[in-house]
């Protein structure tokens, strides 16, 4: 039997597990940064799937592990980062969590569950923060008044979902109805499926079922390339207007063959402000034996800002893929 393992490599705690820690250790990281990884079962020695993220927030930021019990009368979810509210439609599931310490959130115990697994075998890693471009923001801005965000993702998904697909469908419905308060990516899995959920703009989202023959490294980059069939409901779920909205607003982008390009439509273009993210992407590709070549694929650049936390970064010459196969 194959299993899916969430690996939350929390550098805040100094407990970097093999994949995430090694993927970023060779280059300096900046604050407010994460690096998300995925490794399909056909690429691992034990035939299992691994996923997770490094969380780089500050040198010392208290996290705690715990177990949220099942609640037969359901739960009411709310947030201190937005006006999001949601009430369970029935009993909730028991799940583990790795949360921010209550001292960081006005003594509330429910903030930022980040990673865990529930009694049904659904696991979650949340989140990888990304960003959207100005045209997407103008057309469909994030909704801080009601939108769901990192404060609640994992708690809602793990408390309410019996399968990974259920988690994707629930999160998608909440974004449809209430929006998101930040652009994020979340990985949701069970023993049968692993899904990557991406919040693209205020009410637009996409979720892709990940195959077992690919790897992925993403250090806070929202427009890493991928092709997806929006009509394939077995492997792709998304908001109803994911393509029609940008087409009507005039900012939709397409691949050379005419297929709608989700990542470039909503994501930001390559720029200096992402130089430290690209450093981590390059290091991750090297670690997973699919290296990029300096001079051909990227250049080392200096960060000359007065408040820079690292002196050098990198910029790629052209957009890179979200998914790849190791050498």
Go through each PLM region and give its residues.
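Bacterial N-terminal signal peptides that target proteins for export
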Residues: 2-17
